[in-house]
């Protein structure tokens, strides 16, 4: 699952040429996939019923396929980077190499956070930002590799509200990563940008400069 804001940044800016992308596509595999897909040129009737005696097993059997996705995405991100000169990873870190306070989010607000990080690091603040490019499957290993070893406090921002839940999805994923591994970390969750409400540099700045997690939530 790749997250995009939609209206705000979903317009075409610089389209990559299909001929340049073609070497990255396994055309034989693509043809084989299409040969088994539904097509009005050779119609067929298919059912989707699975009996309860094997449904559970079928759902679990796909785990290996999903587990392989992060490495595949990382590989093709590197290949696209060779074409464009813009290299991305599943989790991109930006900021001070010895950051103690890090904000985690995804989508267009990352650019606002990036400018805020520039402003604060220029003044000697040890802060950073992690921009999530691949949310599902969530790769704990790639995530931890992106977090500076010096980090003491994480602020995880979600662009959704889950009424009744203990926290929003990205926040809970990050908490789970640290809890399962017994790694001590102060983690606070927050929300931003619902219904395209603007997120300002001043608001991001408060996440870094608030003296305590409780104050961060209030900001």
Language-model features and meaning:
Residues 75-210, 214:
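Thiamine diphosphate
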Residues 5-92:
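Conformationally flexible catalytic loops at phosphate/diphosphate-handling active centers
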Residues 31-48, 129, 165-180, 219:
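Hydrophobic transmembrane alpha-helix bundles
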Residues 1-3, 42, 102:
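Short, flexible coil/turn micro-motifs enriched in small/turn-prone residues
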Residues 1-11, 208-218:
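Single conserved hydrophobic/aromatic residue that forms the stacking wall/gate
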């Amino acid at each position: 699952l790749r997250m995009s804001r939609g209206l705000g940044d979903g317009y075409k800016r610089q389209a990559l040429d299909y001929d340049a992308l073609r070497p990255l596509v396994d055309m034989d595999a693509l043809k084989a996939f299409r040969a088994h897909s539904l097509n009005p040129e050779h119609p067929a009737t298919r059912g989707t019923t699975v009996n309860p005696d094997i449904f559970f097993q079928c759902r679990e059997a796909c785990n290996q396929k999903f587990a392989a996705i992060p490495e595949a995405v990382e590989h093709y991100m590197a290949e696209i980077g060779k074409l464009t000169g813009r290299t991305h990873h599943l989790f991109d870190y930006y900021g001070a190499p010895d950051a103690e306070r890090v904000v985690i989010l995804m989508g267009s607000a990352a650019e606002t956070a990036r400018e805020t990080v520039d402003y604060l690091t220029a003044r000697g603040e040890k802060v950073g930002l992690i921009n999530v490019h691949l949310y599902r499957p969530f790769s704990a290993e790639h995530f931890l590799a992106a977090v500076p070893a010096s980090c003491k406090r994480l602020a995880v921002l979600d662009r959704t509200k889950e009424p009744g839940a203990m926290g929003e999805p990205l926040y809970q994923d990050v908490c789970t990563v640290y809890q399962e591994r017994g790694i001590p970390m102060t983690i606070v969750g927050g929300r931003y940008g619902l219904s395209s409400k603007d997120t300002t540099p001043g608001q991001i700045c408060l996440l870094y400069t608030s003296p305590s997690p409780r104050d961060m939530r209030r900001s």
